[in-house]
Amino acid sequence: IKAHLKMSNAKEAVVIGGGFIGVEMAENFAELSGVNTTLVEAASHILPPVDKETAAFAHNEMRKHGINLILSDAVTEFGSNEIRLSSGRRIPYDIAVLAIGVKPETSLALACGIQTGKSGGIKVNKFMQTSDENIYAGGDSVEVEGFVTGEEILVPLAGPANRQGRIIADNIAGYKSTYKKSLGSAVVKVFDLTIASAGCSEETLLKRNIPYLKTFTFGFSHASYYPGATRTMYKLLFNKEGDILGIQAAGYEGVEKRVDVMAASMRNGLKVWELIDLELCYAPPYSSAKDPVNILGMHADNILKGFVKPAFIEDIDNAMLIDIRSKAEFERETINGAVNIFTPELRERYKELPRDKKIILFCNTGFQSYVASRILIQRGFDNVYSLAAGITLYKELVKDKLFNAEKVLMQPM
């Protein structure tokens, strides 16, 4: 590809598909000087394993590095020097790369009479045997059981494929080895940003009608007072029994480390409240005394115990919004329509608040709004919610234009 770009003096590169390969290709094109890069994705966001909130961080990072990101639009036709989209839009191109997903290559298996499943992948048992017990299969073309859903899924990732190869070798050699359910743990680099996930996304849980709860939080990559600390956004999905259903993270340092810990916790059946007790490595350059994984456990535990009711960006319609930060912070920026009551003033001003209307409290990342909600709950309010991850997540989503601008317009006072 680099040789072609050099020989043809190409200036316009288009990548079709926003999966991991498409995102990595777009980044590589964008890093080449003089090449304008466009990524086209038919879905509403890139990176299918994660939800829109997590993908928003990747969208903003790609735009920051000059990539023209086109979402919810599909390619309908290739011309000699332009690509036509379903919206009618036309994009010039000198080189195009199709990164539109993978389909299992099972022609050999089908020719041998081996059974395939709903997804088109080869059906195997826990020993990686196909419907012909003398033939084994592994890798991108096989169906495996999903850890959370229990359904047969395709997991086109190198880690599971390597483990399956070892299991097949063991069984051929007479050592009984089995493949466990797959979490689909994955990570991708998006310029300076890292996106990682394990387990199910919220979109998957909704499609499968699996009951769930969720929360968002921000955690520092290491102790905030140690130089170079950056924030990571975490999205945790769990159920009322405390089972961890999925984790997603977006940040610049230590992202995959925390998701790996969460994946190991899921694999070993830990409940969300047991995350609180995990003893993880700590020194100021590497983490905080309460690691983000511990904090995630505390967030979920507080929700399950009824200490706090979380609210999310999609809940702000028809709610009274209270910015509980200082007046200076409020005047610098806030959510459109919010009223300012500083947390220390709540004990005196709580009588101003209605008890018959939903109240959403928010701060920068969610900690102070939790404290404020406890103050009100202890005064008999049962209509009080804390905006998960606060105005920091809100601003990232507004930047990505995920919500109607009228509802979420940032207003300097």
Where are these regions (language model features)?
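FAD-site-proximal beta/loop scaffold in flavoenzymes
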Residues: 1-8, 81-84, 90-167, 261, ...
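Hydrophobic Val/Ile/Leu positions in short beta-strands of Rossmann-like dinucleotide-binding domains
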Residues: 15-16, 361
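Rossmann-like dinucleotide-binding cores of NAD(P)H-dependent redox enzymes
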Residues: 12-14, 20-77, 157-160, 179-203, ...
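Mid-to-C-terminal Rossmann-like scaffold of FAD/NAD(P)H-dependent oxidoreductases
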Residues: 141-252, 284, 288, 292-319
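Rhodanese-like catalytic fold shared by cysteine-dependent sulfurtransferases
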Residues: 273-320, 326-360, 364-413
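A short, polar/charged loop-to-alpha-helix boundary motif
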Residues: 253-272
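Residue-level detector of alpha-helix initiation sites
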Residues: 20-21, 45, 103, 152, ...
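Short loop/edge segments at beta-strand edges and connector loops
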Residues: 71-73, 79, 118, 216, ...
